[in-house]
Amino acid sequence: MPPLDITDERLTREDTGYHKGLHSRQLQMIALGGAIGTGLFLGAGGRLASAGPGLFLVYGICGIFVFLILRALGELVLHRPSSGSFVSYAREFYGEKVAFVAGWMYFLNWAMTGIVDTTAIAHYCHYWRAFQPIPQWTLALIALLVVLSMNLISVRLFGELEFWASLIKVIALVTFLIVGTVFLAGRYKIDGQETGVSLWSSHGGIVPTGLLPIVLVTSGVVFAYAAIELVGIAAGETAEPAKIMPRAINSVVLRIACFYVGSTVLLALLLPYTAYKEHVSPFVTFFSKIGIDAAGSVMNLVVLTAALSSLNAGLYSTGRILRSMAINGSGPRFTAPMSKTGVPYGGILLTAGIGLLGIILNAIKPSQAFEIVLHIAATGVIAAWATIVACQLRLHRMANAGQLQRPKFRMPLSPFSGYLTLAFLAGVLILMYFDEQHGPWMIAATVIGVPALIGGWYLVRNRVTAVAHHAIDHTKSVAVVHSADPI
C-alpha cells in the first residue's frame, strides 16, 4: 500500500486557512504546560494515598516512554507539519480507516478529559467555603461556558492564554520544589512529624501497600502525561516548526522529568503517604499542613488555573483534529468551516456539547465522576500515542526502503524503541481492564465504543471514497487510491 505524497492536496488542504499566530515562546510553553495539568495537580493525591512513596518510580518509567513518544512525534512533524497532527500522519501512512479510528479516539480522549477538568475545577472551588453550597455540576457548567467563550476568539489569544496559564503552573511547581526542599534540608517537622526518608521506614517502606497498587496506578499516571501530543497540533500554526519543534521537545522532556518525578519524591519525603487524599491536591495538602492556609488557597488557585488551561487546550486540539477529518470525509461536515479569525469553531462546539454529558455525570455521581471518566479518557490517550509511534515506525521502514528521507530530528533507537513503547502501551491498557473498581466501566466503554467506531466507518466510507476520488481527479495522483477503498 503506497503512502500519500506529502505534496498531495489531500494532505495539505486541511492546513489551509489557519493563521500562523503561535510564536516560539508560546509553543514551548504549550508543550510544557500541556503536560502539567490535572493529572498531577489533583490526581497525584489519590495515587500517593493508594500506592505510597514508590509512585515516583511509576512517573519515572512512564516519563521515559513519554520522551520516546515525543521524539516520534517530533520526527513526524519535521517530516510534514500539520494541524491534523497524528490523524493526518495516520492518513498518510495507513489510509483513511486508521485515521478515522485515531481521530475519533482522540476526540473521545479530549471530550472525556474535558469532563475530568470540569470535575476537577468544581472540586477545587469547593476548597473555599464560599463555593461549598454551590452544587458540583453548577460549577462544572460555569467553567465549561467560560473556557468555551475564550477558545472561540482566535488562536493568538489561545496561545497567549496558554502561555500565561502554563507559566503560572510552572511557577507554582518551582515554588513548591523550593519550599519543600528548604523544609527537607532544614529537617523541619511538619504536622508534628519528621521529614525525610525516615517517613518511609516508619510508614511501611517505599511500597507500603504492595506492588499491585503501584502497577494499578500506572493508567492514571499515563493520563497525567496526557496532552504532550498537543505540541504536534500547535506546530501546524507556527511559522518555523523545523526550528522550534526540536528545541521545544528536548527542553520539555527534562523539565517534565524534574517536575513530575521531583514533585512526587518531594511530596513523599515531606508527609506520610497517608496524609494525602483523593480529590484533594497534594500540593494544597502540603501548604495547609505547614500552617500557611493562605498558601494553600494560593496553590488551590494555581491548580484551578491548570484545570482551566487543560480544558482550553482540549477544545483547541479537537477543533483542529475534527476539521482535518471533516475535510477528508470522515468527520461531521459542520466541523470543517473556520471563522474569520482562523478558528474551526464546529469541532470546538461539538466537544463542548459532549462536555455537557459530564455535567450530568457530576449531578448523578459527583463522588466518582473524576476517576470514572479519567480511565475512559486514558484509552483515547493510549490510542493517540500508539498511532504516533506506529506512524513513526512506518516512516522508518519506508526510509530504509528508499521511499522517503527521514528528518535529522529522529526517534532514538528506532525501530526497537518504537516496538517497546507499543508493548508498554498495550500493557497499560490491559491493566486498565483488570482494575477492580474502574475495569467494568472500561469494559462497558469498549462494548459501546467498538461497534460505534465500526458503524461510524460504514456510515462515512462512501463520503470518504467520494472525497478521495475527487482528489485523484484534481491532482491526477494515484497515490491516494489506497485510502479511497471502502473496505
Curated annotation (Swiss-Prot):
InterPro entries: AA-permease/SLC12A_dom, Amino_acid_permease_CS. GO terms for biological process: amino acid transport; transmembrane transport. One of its GO terms (cellular component) is plasma membrane. It is found in: Cell membrane. Disulfide bonds: none annotated. It is a multi-pass membrane protein. Keywords: Amino-acid transport, Cell membrane, Membrane, Transmembrane, Transmembrane helix, Transport. Disruption phenotype: Asparagine transport is partially impaired in the mutant. Knockout mutant is impaired in nitrogen incorporation from asparagine into other amino acids, such as glutamate and glutamine. Growth of the knockout strain is greatly reduced at pH 5.5 in the presence of asparagine as sole nitrogen source. Mutant is not attenuated in immune-competent mice. PROSITE patterns: AMINO_ACID_PERMEASE_1. Pfam families: AA_permease. The chain crosses the membrane at residues 26-46, 50-70, 98-118, 133-153, 163-183, 214-234, 256-276, 290-310, 341-361, 369-389, 414-434, 440-460. Its main location: membrane. Belongs to the amino acid-polyamine-organocation (APC) superfamily. Amino acid transporter (AAT) (TC 2.A.3.1) family. Dual function in both nitrogen assimilation and in protection against acid stress during infection. Involved in asparagine uptake. This is L-asparagine permease 2. The gene is ansP2.
